[in-house]
Swiss-Prot record:
Organism the protein comes from: Lactiplantibacillus plantarum (strain ATCC BAA-793 / NCIMB 8826 / WCFS1) (Lactobacillus plantarum)
One Pfam family per UniProt: TK
Keyword field contains GTP-binding: no
Gene Ontology CC terms, in alphabetical order: cytosol
Family annotation (InterPro entries): P-loop_NTPase (IPR027417), Thymidine_kinase (IPR001267), Thymidine_kinase_CS (IPR020633)
Catalyzed reaction equations: thymidine + ATP = dTMP + ADP + H(+)
Subcellular location: Cytoplasm
Catalytic site: E86
Recorded superkingdom: Bacteria
Family annotation (NCBIfam families): PRK04296.1-4 (NF003299), PRK04296.1-5 (NF003300)
Encoding gene, per UniProt annotation: tdk
Single GO biological process annotation from the record: thymidine metabolic process
Protein's recorded name: Thymidine kinase
Record note on quaternary structure: Homotetramer.
């Protein structure tokens, strides 16, 4: 039975490596997958999913006006699975299109992304995935500064925490850190 999955976690929780692993497992059994990612994420070039451990592969970029349902229907309506990286950047209409892929095309859709931004506000895509997903699962990682579970993302600029600004600023370890609640509100000064 096809379902819509949302797997969320703080930065460095292994979301992208999980997508690559799931894709590999399907493809090893000669089952095709469709991988999509946000067109906003250009750290490794637009149209790629890349993990911090160095694995990378092509993906179809999703922009604000992209119709994901039509991409899947026209590209491969017999795909075994649709995998979405950086799902927090999806718009409401994208999430509804993913639900249609599950309900009409009977293809499971697995989405991976951040739940909340550095201001501790939900991303639009995450908000609607939390509402419409059949299954929701947290991917865990540890706080950058202690051994507690990281549940938030903290933005730093010049070694100082940042709590205001634009929601979307693409960056990796140089800009964002996974943190526990305590270190979100009381972070140490970075000396890197």
């Amino acid at each position: 039975m096809a379902q819509l999955f949302f797997r969320y976690g703080a930065m460095n929780s292994g979301k992208t490596i999980e997508i690559l692993k799931v894709a590999h497992n399907y493809e090893e059994q000669d089952k095709s997958v469709i991988i999509l990612t946000s067109g906003l994420d250009n750290r490794d070039g637009v149209g790629y999913v890349a993990s911090r451990i160095g694995l990378k592969r092509e993906a179809t970029p999703v922009f604000d006006d992209t119709n994901i349902f039509e991409i899947v229907k026209q590209t491969n309506p017999d795909a075994a699975c649709v995998l979405i990286d950086e799902a927090q950047f999806l718009k409401k209409h994208h999430v509804l299109e993913l639900a249609d892929i599950v309900d009409e095309l009977k293809i499971p859709v697995m989405t991976f992304g951040l739940k909340n931004d550095f201001r501790n506000e939900l991303f639009e895509g995450s908000k609607y995935l939390l509402l419409y997903a059949d299954k929701i699962e947290e991917m865990k990682t540890i706080c950058w500064f202690c051994r507690k579970k990281a549940i938030m993302n903290l933005r730093f600029h010049d070694g100082q925490p940042v709590y205001e600004g634009e929601q979307v600023q693409i960056g990796g370890n140089e800009a964002y850190y996974p943190v526990c609640r305590h270190h979100y509100f009381y972070p140490p000064k970075l000396t890197k």
